[in-house]
Amino acid sequence: NSWGTEFGEDGYFYVSYEDANIGTTNVVYTKLGDANNFDNIYQSDLLGWRGQLGYEKDQAYFANVYRAGEDEELAAVSFYATDVDTTYQVYVVPEFEDEDSLNDRKLVAEGSFEQAGYYTVRLDEAVKLKDNQKFAVVVHIQTPGAIHPVAIEYDADSRTREFDITDGEGYI
């Protein structure tokens, strides 16, 4: 049990083979990328996929804003597909100032995923960034049949409430 002694009875718990809920929502990582693929990582998912949001539609835009730590090139982005047959478009706003800047996005990659999961998408062409430059990554995602296609993090329960997830600026 990776949840420690705080879960169940000192870390032990009973699961019936006839449990109606076990195995209905699982996340499994079957292919891991090399940790040295890229020089830097900018992230806003310190807790990982904890829930989903959307607007009762199968598609949505979401964005995260970052500040470059040095002169560099943005070569890839990573995000979740919450179900099968998901299509996406990835955009970058190289000079982010405020919400209105999101309208100045540039398409840098598009494609589809057959399965749900966490994916790293290489950009068609790397985006040059200057040290301290504020930029945004915008993803438009469409997941047929979904009403909440965007994976999100939040303080879902006692195991996650102690984490500070105010690390950045995000939009849905």
Task: Annotate each predicted stretch with a short phrase.
Residues 17-103, 127-134, 140-172:
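Beta-sheet-rich sandwich/jelly-roll-like modules and their strand-loop junctions
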Residues 99-113:
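Terminal beta-strand-rich extracellular "head" domains
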Residues 60, 117-118:
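Repeat-based blade/solenoid architectures
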Residues 118-126:
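Exposed aromatic-hydrophobic patches
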Residues 1-7, 12:
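Catalytic nucleophile-His microenvironment captured as a short glycine-rich beta-strand/loop
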Residues 9-10, 116, 158:
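Short edge beta-strand segments in beta-sheet-rich domains
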Residues 110-117, 129:
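Short proline/glycine- and polar residue-rich coil/turn motifs
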